[in-house]
Amino acid sequence: MKGQKYYSDYHVWIEPIHSRIVKLGLSSQMREHLGNILHIDLPSVGSFIKEGEELCILESSKSAIEVLSPVSGEVLEVNTALEDDILPVNNATESEGWFVVLQLTEDFRSESFSLEP
């Protein structure tokens, strides 16, 4: 399970780190649909995000969208490097372009997600 990416209906990938800790980012398919990402508003460390609610806001060359979280949990880490340099979201969406690390409210259940974007 560790190192494997799962994809949600919200076009967010989920990479389990431990049973209740996951890394989240935007699927490359959605990034291509949005065009060039220009800015991102990320949540604060310590904030709580509920499944189906705002994970972050992305501004692209085509529009601004609210990215929804596929899971509920507390934000443990934020990729603050993206605030100064958004290029990883555009060029390495599924690696250096990750958004946050969450501590989930319950164990991650991979069967709720797809292995394909």
From Swiss-Prot:
The keyword Nuclease does not apply. The keyword tRNA processing does not apply. Keywords: Lipoyl. Belongs to the GcvH family. PROSITE patterns: BIOTINYL_LIPOYL (PS50968), LIPOYL (PS00189). Its cofactor is (R)-lipoate. This is Glycine cleavage system H-like protein. GO terms for biological process: glycine decarboxylation via glycine cleavage system. One of its GO terms (cellular component) is cytosol. Binds 1 lipoyl cofactor covalently. Residues 21-103 form the Lipoyl-binding domain. The modification N6-lipoyllysine is found at residue 62.
